[in-house]
Amino acid sequence: MALTLFDTDEYRPPVWKSYLYQLQQEAPHPRRVTCTCEVENRPKYYGREYHGMISREETDQLLSVAEGSYLIRESQRQPGTYTLALRFGSQTRNFRLYYDGKHFVGEKRFESIHDLVTDGLITLYIETKAAEYIAKMTINPIYEHIGYTTLNREPAYKQHMAVLKETHDEKEATGQDGVSEKRLTSLVRRATLKENEQIPKYEKVHNFKVHTFRGPHWCEYCANFMWGLIAQGVKCADCGLNVHKQCSKMVPNDCKPDLKHVKKVYSCDLTTLVKAHITKRPMVVDMCIREIESRGLNSEGLYRVSGFSDLIEDVKMAFDRDGEKADISVNMYEDINIITGALKLYFRDLPIPLITYDAYPKFIESAKIMDPDEQLETLHEALRSLPPAHCETLRYLMAHLKRVTLHEKENLMSAENLGIVFGPTLMRSPELDPMAALNDIRYQRLVVELLIKNEDILF
């Protein structure tokens, strides 16, 4: 039966393209031209390939023996500087050579001259033979067909369905019905309804870093070989996607972080975290707010009173270590100020603030407007400029803080007081000038106060 399937199946060309790999195999090999006499003042980091201060004509003669021949000479025009002379394409190529603990002529740095020359010959050969091919590599990508997106779709879908099933089971267990829903305030009901919406598909740019691949590697965007000895391409630090540097410019903003690349919860980019864990908001925000609302809304000075810093650090480490399994219950942390402190610390530790640097000026400008209607309209526009994951988290936090103000008689925390606490926590000035940042503090407070008071209108 398997044979029949094979016979009737249509022919499909190989996914991975071998042309550039074959070219790398054909590239000239390095041939060191050694100096037969002892050279005075030879730098200790060069070997017998160093010939001292010889002329270009003598260099040409020494290298004419074969393609890939190389030597190092001291420049006659600029004594104290060194040149790597390399035979390629029946010509001598001269490159200014540098050393800072590693050898380099460009961006790449090498442990040995031999590796530098090997990589250089591969690059010269491929770029000479396949310049037109390389220029067109990105035209017909395989990325959307068999690449990263497809490979990650099934696990994400299964986990998402598990989340939806868990929500449904919780409803049945608690016996929710129309009567209980009517008893909810409109504020809480809206937040509850939004909780049950499907997890949105947030866009996230890939976090590409130059990477050295050990062994042959192929680009997961264009399917072509990634040539060279080191720094052959880039790798996404969040999802592990491997592509050519030029292909990285074409990859869509669809990074789906792998949990093995996301090592912690605190100090992690917010969008990266929610995509890695397939959640609407960071787990820290959801879990801390649930805990605070279950036992802390009447606590005097909620969010204003500081918790014990060592225990707040314990909560942080628990989230970094255990994620959503972190225990922040009353049995572990009786003082609710420890939980509020951990939540504030999460926002302070974000590398990109909840109200992002890009959106910051728009929020500050809205706070300066005197006309209330125009102010809200401008604030609404500012919210639209936030990344979706940031906006959703801000919405959830403001709905929570609005509920905190409903208990103001007991906890003494008004929208104004909460603005004082959360203004500098959620917003950080992109200005390096400390005086300019200091002048913005009152507007930061006002922004948060306005967001809390008008939460039902703005979100």
From Swiss-Prot:
Cite the SH2 domain residue spans from the record: 49-135
Q: Which domain of life is it from?
A: Eukaryota
Q: How is it modified after translation?
A: Phosphorylated. Phosphorylation is EPHA4 kinase activity-dependent.
**Which GO biological-process labels does this protein carry?**
ephrin receptor signaling pathway; motor neuron axon guidance; regulation of axonogenesis; regulation of GTPase activity; regulation of small GTPase mediated signal transduction; signal transduction
- N-acetylalanine sites (modified residues): A2
Q: Which SUPFAM superfamilies match?
A: Cysteine-rich domain (SSF57889), GTPase activation domain, GAP (SSF48350), SH2 domain (SSF55550)
Residues with Phosphothreonine modification = T192, T340
Q: Where are the zinc fingers (Phorbol-ester/DAG-type)?
A: 205-255
Q: Where is this site: Arginine finger?
A: R304
Q: Which Gene Ontology terms cover its molecular function?
A: ephrin receptor binding; GTPase activator activity; zinc ion binding
Leader sequence segment: none
Q: Which CDD domains match?
A: C1_alphaCHN (cd20856), RhoGAP_chimaerin (cd04372), SH2_a2chimerin_b2chimerin (cd10352)
Q: What happens when the gene is disrupted?
A: Mice are viable and fertile but display a loss of coordination of limb movement which phenocopies the one of Epha4 mutant mice.
The record's PANTHER family line, in alphabetical order, gives:
CHIMERIN FAMILY MEMBER, N-CHIMAERIN
Q: How does it assemble?
A: Interacts with EPHA4; effector of EPHA4 in axon guidance linking EPHA4 activation to RAC1 regulation. May also interact with EPHB1 and EPHB2.
Name-wise, this protein is N-chimaerin
Q: Which organism is it from?
A: Mus musculus
- Designated gene of the protein: Chn1
